[in-house]
């Protein structure tokens, strides 16, 4: 696991619109102390997936802000928060970020 993110929760949301993802991640970053770890464009659609890191409470606040901002702009495909990611989850997240 990257020492930079050790002990941090992971928040992930996916929207049908890549443009809406950037608006939503901006809202998330302004709402709470989170680090945007990556944006992954969907290969088969115009959407994208955003990964962010921080304390559980900050990721929760950021996720709420992101989804509230995204809702009028795009369909929310999925979202989740992993409070204490396993080494396997950390490895999988790194693989999607560093490709």
Regions found by a protein language model. Give the residues of each.
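Short, low-order "capping/linker" segments at domain edges
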Residues: 87-99
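Short amphipathic alpha-helices in soluble, non-transmembrane regions
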Residues: 27, 62-69
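A short linear hydrophobic-aromatic micro-motif
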Residues: 34-40, 78-79
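Conserved short beta-strand edge segments in small beta-sheet-based binding/regulatory domains
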Residues: 72-84
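Helix N-cap motif at beta-to-alpha junctions
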Residues: 53-59
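Short glycine-/aliphatic-rich beta-strand segments at the starts of folded cytosolic domains
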Residues: 4-15
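Solvent-exposed alpha-helices and their adjacent loops that cap or buttress functional pockets
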Residues: 2-6, 29, 40-44, 74
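Short amphipathic alpha-helix segments
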Residues: 19-33
């Amino acid at each position: 696991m990257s020492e930079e993110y050790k002990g941090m929760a992971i928040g992930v949301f996916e929207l049908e619109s890549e443009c809406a993802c950037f608006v939503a991640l901006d809202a998330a970053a302004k709402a709470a102390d989170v680090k945007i770890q990556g944006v992954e464009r969907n290969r088969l659609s115009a959407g994208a997936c955003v990964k962010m890191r921080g304390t559980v409470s900050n990721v929760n606040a950021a996720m709420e802000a992101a989804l509230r901002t995204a809702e009028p702009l795009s369909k929310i495909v999925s979202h989740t928060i992993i409070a204490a990611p396993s080494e396997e989850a950390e490895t999988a997240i790194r693989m999607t970020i560093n490709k």
